[in-house]
């Protein structure tokens, strides 16, 4: 997960080597660790065929320094909560799948309508895959309720907001 560390510091001297224009031997760099090699003149580069794939949770602000210089070296593909509903077919129960989609959709509408939250806080289908082993009530009490409570911690009328979330979930 790319926002779990300060990405510019993690890449350090390889900062430029990440850029597609500096890939391959043409972009080789000498790092501070060159003396650890048998040949201290040996250089490091990122091959053209190596792809760095990272995930990023927009609402996780544990580390908030993904600077623009580093950001422009990556392609961003947004995945919305409602884009992977087909994974719920893995529940192997069409009725449960339909109910999961209905509950997730209703809950996500309420989340997005809550002041201080937005679509980035919506619940994705992967949470509902837990329904293979638990029921809807346990999914709410053990997973969704604690997560949503954390989202709204410190907001005005937390209790009322949680009641609206639960009502939407239980529709």
Language-model features, listed with the residues they occupy:
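C-terminal regulatory/interaction module of P-loop NTP-utilizing enzymes
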Residues: 1-171
């Amino acid at each position: 997960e790319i926002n779990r560390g300060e990405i510019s510091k993690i890449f350090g001297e390889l900062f430029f080597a990440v850029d597609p224009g500096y890939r391959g031997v043409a972009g080789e760099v000498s790092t501070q660790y060159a003396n650890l090699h048998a040949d201290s003149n040996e250089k490091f580069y990122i091959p053209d065929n190596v792809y760095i794939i990272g995930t990023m949770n927009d609402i996780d602000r544990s580390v908030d320094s993904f600077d623009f210089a580093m950001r422009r070296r990556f392609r961003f593909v947004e995945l919305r909560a409602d884009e992977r509903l087909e994974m719920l077919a893995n529940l192997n129960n069409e009725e449960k799948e339909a109910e999961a989609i209905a509950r997730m959709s209703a809950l996500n509408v309420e989340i997005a309508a809550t002041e201080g939250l937005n679509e980035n806080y919506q619940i994705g289908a992967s949470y509902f895959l837990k329904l293979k082993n638990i029921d809807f009530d346990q999914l709410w009490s053990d997973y969704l309720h604690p997560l949503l409570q954390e989202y709204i911690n410190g907001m005005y009328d937390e209790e009322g907001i949680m009641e609206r979330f639960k009502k939407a979930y239980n529709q």
